[in-house]
């Protein structure tokens, strides 16, 4: 209120000893009003996770991402219930300590339990349900997404968050994933056409 009434851009927050503890700007207030449910850290910055894979230079990628300020690392491969995943999680934990790790992808009870036992902080569930994933086409193996979410929940219940990855074509898919046990839902194609999404903009040639 003070910012808008006095038409000032910044308002420092001080204690009784006149020590500055923070700074509020009109941009901060506008952001809070427009995006009240955004996930932010203690400094008010958006939380960011980045994928590093599980082979090759994944440790170097993790190091550079953490240096850039990433909050969480995503170790994801097509088949997360594997020795490759176990090795990657062990290496990341050994090198970077308690950094939050999301592991995936799995689609079975055993796979979810495997990732839980590895000590990941969240489990990514889904093998092939999304438009961009070719695992089912190339291997002829996969589990329907809602069944995969439910099996993962049976394995870990409330102990580890489950992230439903893929298969969201309509708003009802988000609802179904959440009631089946997912704590969060990843969106790919649903957001790929937005202005904020990276990639080339291809305009319709037809008038």
Which residues does each predicted region cover?
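Active-site-adjacent beta->alpha loops and helix N-cap segments on the catalytic face
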Residues: 19-21, 25-39, 57-61, 77-101, ...
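Short flexible coil/turn linkers enriched for glycine and charged/polar residues
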Residues: 4-7, 17, 42-44, 55-56, ...
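Catalytic cores of alpha/beta
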Residues: 60-68, 101, 106-125, 168-183
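The conserved cystathionine-beta-synthase
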Residues: 1-7, 14-15, 31-33, 57-64
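Active-site beta->alpha loop and helix N-cap motifs at the rims of alpha/beta catalytic domains
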Residues: 50-59, 64-73
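Alpha/beta catalytic cores of nucleotide-metabolism and tRNA/nucleoside-modifying enzymes
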Residues: 51, 118-121, 140-164, 168-207
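Short beta-strand/loop segments at the ligand-binding rim of alpha/beta enzyme cores
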Residues: 41-51, 92-107, 122, 155-166
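Cytosolic beta-strand hydrophobic patch enriched in CBS
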Residues: 3, 9-24, 49, 73-76, ...
């Amino acid at each position: 209120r003070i910012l808008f009434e006095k038409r000032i851009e910044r308002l420092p927050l001080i204690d009784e000893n006149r020590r500055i503890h923070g700074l509020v700007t009109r941009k901060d207030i506008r952001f809070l009003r427009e995006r009240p449910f955004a996930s932010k850290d203690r400094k008010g910055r958006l939380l960011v996770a980045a994928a590093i894979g599980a082979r090759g230079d994944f440790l170097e990628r993790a190091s550079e991402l953490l240096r850039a300020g990433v909050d969480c690392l995503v170790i994801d491969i097509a088949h997360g219930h594997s020795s490759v995943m176990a090795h990657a999680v062990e290496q990341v934990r050994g090198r970077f300590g308690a950094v939050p790790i999301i592991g995936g992808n799995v689609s079975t009870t055993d796979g979810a339990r495997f990732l839980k036992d590895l000590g990941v902080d969240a489990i990514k569930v889904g093998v092939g349900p999304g438009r961009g994933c070719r695992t089912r086409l190339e291997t002829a193996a996969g589990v329907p997404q809602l069944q995969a979410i439910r099996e993962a929940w049976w394995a870990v219940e409330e102990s580890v968050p489950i992230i439903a990855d893929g298969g969201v074509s309509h708003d009802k898919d988000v609802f179904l994933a959440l009631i089946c046990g997912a704590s969060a839902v990843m969106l790919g194609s649903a957001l790929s056409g937005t202005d904020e999404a990276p990639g080339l903009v291809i305009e319709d040639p037809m008038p």
